[in-house]
Amino acid sequence: MVTIENLHFSYSRHLVFNDVSLSLEGGKIYGLLGQNGVGKTTLLKIISGLLKVSSGSCSVMNYDPAKREPGFLSELFYIPEDFVGPDITINQFAKLRGDFYPSYDANKFSRLMTDFEVNGNYKFTKLSFGQQKKAIIAFALATNTKLILMDEPSNGLDIPSKAQLRRVISQASSDETCIVISTHQVRDLENLIDPIIILDKNGVLLNESIENISRNLCFEFSPVPSESAIYSEPALGGYVVVNRNTSDQECKVNIEALFNTVLLNKEVIKDIFKK
């Protein structure tokens, strides 16, 4: 679906990616994690063709995204973090834009709008940021494109809406669709995203499935900190402790603890997951 090889990208003199290689497959919902400023949004824009690589290559569905060819654009939908809709009704927007996507399903859009409890007869400009966000997510999923990129989709959503978001994305995923979700609110999407990609300054620290992470790392609660642990952090009544998984059993992954473990123990993690 997406193949990135030896990618370099910089803004003027600010290097963002240095020799990055990465592949994304269909049938998965990727969680794209990283501290602010490491390039999560930049990566999504490169994949969607809004930014051109400095060197190296990025191939998406066998297209060069920077060329923005019609066949490419009809199979990709990108939702920016700060989406603001035009001064027309949501239904008008869907009718106008739906024709650009060969697999767009108007009935699916209507169902998703109902699930999100958003009235399509309202103008975007009359809705809250969260309601606008739900409307564009509903439209994106109804396009049935092969690749959907979401930048911080849970921002602006209240707690019930976040539950709705998890449900509709899970139901809309398929073997043919690749969904990439950039987020710093991992608890909102913890049971949805798999595999996990963690970016650091200039590159990719981790790109692994939840299954492989659970086979190699164990996340446990301990009343006291452990000096032998790879990582530990205070929690209510004790500590979350991360160790190598030396058993034959898979451990439930704590994505927030995983993120901190990877950032603070880069060489150890690199050694554990070396191919």
Name what the model sees in each region.
Residues 56-67, 71-72:
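Conserved ABC transporter NBD signature motif
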Residues 70-71, 78-135:
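ABC-family P-loop ATPase nucleotide-binding domains
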Residues 164-180, 184-243:
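ABC transporter nucleotide-binding domain
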